[in-house]
Amino acid sequence: MDDKIKNYNNLPYRIGVGMVIINQKKEIFTGQRIDSARQYWQMPQGGIILGETYSKAVLREMKEEIGCNKAIIMAESRNWYSYHIPKFLVHKLWNSNFKGQKQKWFLIKFLGKDEDININTIYPEFSQWKWMNSNQLINNALPFKRKLYKAVINEFHIFLL
């Protein structure tokens, strides 16, 4: 077993950003990961490039993951949110350097049309996408992300009414 996995609890979090992208109906953009055999859905997220602001990172990640960043940032989370990945996944992600992610979340209003969304990007992360309400998202999310999603949606709930 990899020494890093043995020391799982001592591994740091990967710092990143996450986005709750909503359309005019206040539905949430979700994508099904291309590398997942199961039917789990998630919101877009990603890392931060050295020197990049969180807001620039979130708009860059949006463009990279859904092929479009016709949007405005409505809110930034007050809190940082984190999740642990299961130990059996550590060796598959981030060269076994992290136990999970610590993220700043943004609520983003999508200003484009569905036709503007193109998940077939240079480095695709999603095999398919759809708009969901918050309950559908939580019920269909990866189990280790559900608590985080509930907390983020709770913080942004006023925008989702």
Swiss-Prot record:
It holds the Pfam family NUDIX. The keyword Glycoprotein does not apply. Residues 12-154 form the Nudix hydrolase domain. A motif (Nudix box) lies at residues 46-67. Its cofactor is a divalent metal cation. Its EC number is 3.6.1.-. It is an enzyme of class 3 (hydrolase). Keywords: Hydrolase. One of its GO terms (molecular function) is bis(5'-adenosyl)-pentaphosphatase activity. GO terms for biological process: nucleoside phosphate metabolic process; ribose phosphate metabolic process. The keyword Hydrolase applies. Coiled coil: none annotated. CDD domains: NUDIX_Ap4A_hydrolase_plant_like (cd03671). Belongs to the Nudix hydrolase family. RppH subfamily. Accelerates the degradation of transcripts by removing pyrophosphate from the 5'-end of triphosphorylated RNA, leading to a more labile monophosphorylated state that can stimulate subsequent ribonuclease cleavage. This is RNA pyrophosphohydrolase. It comes from Orientia tsutsugamushi (strain Boryong).
